[in-house]
């Protein structure tokens, strides 16, 4: 007899992790605006605090509304469990700090979002964790950088802002041969719609849920997804925090007690508990609403982005276009291997003339908003050199894939003709001034 449970993305985004509320029969996910939860008796409370029984204690650690969001994301990504956070940066921090301690390092591509690059370059070294940045994402270069103190390999699904797509399976093989988990930031993968890195060897996935998952520019959030596939017991020497007695839980062994969900449990009950970067239930409800239309929006984002990229290629004012959906992009063939539902919703381009001309193009948009975000249903533009990557040195910006003339566009779900019309009027206004100068 076939399994009747839903497995398709479009159904999971609406139903995974939730049944109608048993107390009220509410079909929508209720917002549980509570700090804490009553215990049935003192023994029940003791079992919860001792991790001998699952349940709610305090909303800094777990909340029923947040729990639905976590279960839904885990289902969409093909993981066994997820832990939500107050932002993508917090989720990323929790994932890495659960793996690496003072004296350890991680190996990461240099093709990173500016905030990630700064977290790895500035914040983690203050905690004794260093990052070995590899130029690009070639597996052989990553392998060469791994040493006995390496605790993770880190890549982005679609690198921001170079839009490179790593060969996940090859990189995962390299990491696993060394006994190290592969961590993938799948933010640009739109909650697993464009690609599920876990299906290609990733062990841990992180998201800024602020972007396509939320999808409307209203809510900051993040999430860590545990694949449940990494064998912490086999790699006990490198990761004793999962296999040796926990000082904070009277000698509890996470791997022996929780098996495949050991990573997610430790992130929740040690890192999230102590860091305090919890997602609040109101934000979780907004992100759940975003998930319900994710596939519809992502499909439109991708089709609009491809159409805009092709239009820009033919425009006389444009000197170059970078979008992984274009055949000439260096990652296009790899992208076709992994991105089966579209090539994402972000592109960059440069205009002819001095670098300042690019800023004028952004300033002259009327429909398109100039702001620091991606994944909104509205089309967004920004000049990364002077904003998202401004805190990096010139060489670090170039290494990350940012050039002084680059304009990044997060393509929204408006009608493509209206998006193009805004480009046309902006170009007309900009180059009229340039010609008259």
From Swiss-Prot:
Entry-linked PROSITE patterns = CYS_MET_METAB_PP (PS00868)
Give the UniProt entry's GO cellular component terms. Answer: cytoplasm
- Its EC number is 2.5.1.49
| Coarse class of the protein's main subcellular location | cytoplasm
Q: Where in the cell is it found?
A: Cytoplasm
Catalytic reaction list: O-acetyl-L-homoserine + methanethiol = L-methionine + acetate + H(+); O-acetyl-L-homoserine + hydrogen sulfide = L-homocysteine + acetate
Any one GO MF term held by the record is:
cysteine synthase activity
What is the recorded phenotype of mutating residue 436 to G? In strain: JAM 2006
A GO biological-process term: L-homocysteine biosynthetic process
> According to the UniProt entry, which residues carry N6-(pyridoxal phosphate)lysine?
211
Indicate whether Amino-acid biosynthesis appears among the record's keywords. yes
Tell me what happens on changing residue 170 to A. In strain: JAM 2006
Kindly tell me the pathway this chain contributes to: Amino-acid biosynthesis; L-methionine biosynthesis via de novo pathway; L-homocysteine from O-acetyl-L-homoserine
* Induction summary: Up-regulated under sulfur limitation and down-regulated by high methionine concentrations.
Alphabetically list the UniProt keywords: Amino-acid biosynthesis, Cytoplasm, Methionine biosynthesis, Pyridoxal phosphate, Transferase
Q: Which domain of life is it from?
A: Eukaryota
**Which cofactors must be present for this protein to function?**
pyridoxal 5'-phosphate
User: Which family does the record assign?
Assistant: Belongs to the trans-sulfuration enzymes family.
Function noted in UniProt = Catalyzes the conversion of O-acetyl-L-homoserine (OAH) into homocysteine in the methionine biosynthesis pathway. Also has cysteine synthase (O-acetylserine sulfhydrylase) activity in vitro, but seems only be involved in the alternative pathway of methionine biosynthesis in E.nidulans.
**Subunit structure as annotated in this protein's UniProt entry:** Oligomer, probably homohexamer.
The record's section on NCBIfam families has:
OAH_OAS_sulfhy
Under which name does UniProt file this protein?
Homocysteine synthase
Could you tell me which species this protein originates from?
Answer: Emericella nidulans (strain FGSC A4 / ATCC 38163 / CBS 112.46 / NRRL 194 / M139)
Organism lineage string: Eukaryota, Fungi, Dikarya, Ascomycota, Pezizomycotina
Gene name of the encoded protein:
cysD
């Amino acid at each position: 007899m076939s399994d009747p449970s839903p497995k398709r993305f479009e159904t999971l985004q609406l139903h995974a992790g939730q049944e109608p509320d048993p107390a009220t029969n509410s079909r929508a996910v209720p917002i549980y605006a509570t700090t804490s939860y009553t215990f049935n008796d003192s023994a029940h409370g003791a079992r919860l605090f001792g991790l001998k029984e699952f349940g709610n204690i305090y909303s800094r650690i777990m909340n029923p509304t947040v729990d639905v969001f976590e279960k839904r994301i885990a289902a969409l990504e093909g993981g066994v469990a997820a832990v939500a956070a107050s932002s993508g940066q917090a989720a990323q921090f929790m994932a890495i700090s659960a793996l690496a301690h003072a004296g350890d390092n991680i190996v990461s591509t240099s093709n990173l979002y500016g905030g990630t690059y700064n977290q790895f370059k500035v914040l983690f070294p203050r905690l004794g964790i260093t990052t070995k940045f590899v130029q690009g994402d070639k597996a052989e270069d990553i392998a060469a950088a791994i040493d006995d103190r390496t605790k993770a390999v880190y890549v982005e699904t679609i690198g921001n802002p170079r839009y490179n797509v790593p060969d996940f399976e090859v990189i995962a093989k390299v990491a696993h041969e060394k006994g190290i988990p592969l961590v993938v930031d799948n933010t640009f993968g739109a909650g697993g719609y464009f690609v599920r890195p876990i299906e290609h060897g990733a062990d841990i996935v992180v998201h800024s849920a602020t972007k396509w998952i939320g999808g409307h520019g209203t809510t900051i959030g993040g999430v860590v997804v545990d694949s449940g596939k990494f064998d912490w017991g086999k790699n006990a020497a490198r990761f004793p925090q999962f296999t040796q007695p926990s000082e904070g839980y009277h000698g509890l062994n996470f791997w022996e007690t929780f098996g495949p969900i050991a990573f997610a449990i430790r992130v929740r009950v040690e890192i999230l508990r102590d860091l305090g970067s919890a997602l609040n239930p109101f934000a979780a409800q907004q992100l759940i609403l975003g998930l319900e239309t994710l596939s519809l929006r992502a499909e439109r984002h991708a089709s609009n982005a491809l159409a805009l990229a092709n239009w820009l290629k033919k425009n006389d004012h444009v000197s170059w276009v970078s979008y992984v959906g274009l055949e000439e992009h260096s990652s296009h063939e790899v992208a076709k291997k992994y991105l089966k539902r579209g090539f994402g919703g972000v592109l960059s381009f440069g205009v002819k003339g001095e670098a300042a001309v690019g800023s004028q193009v952004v300033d002259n948009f009327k429909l398109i908003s100039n702001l620091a975000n991606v994944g909104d249903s509205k089309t967004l533009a920004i000049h990364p050199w002077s904003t998202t990557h401004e805190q990096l040195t010139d060489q670090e910006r170039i290494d990350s894939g940012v050039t002084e003339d680059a304009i990044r566009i997060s393509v929204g779900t408006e009608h493509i003709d209206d998006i193009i019309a805004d480009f046309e009027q902006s170009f007309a206004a900009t180059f009229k001034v340039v010609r008259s100068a």
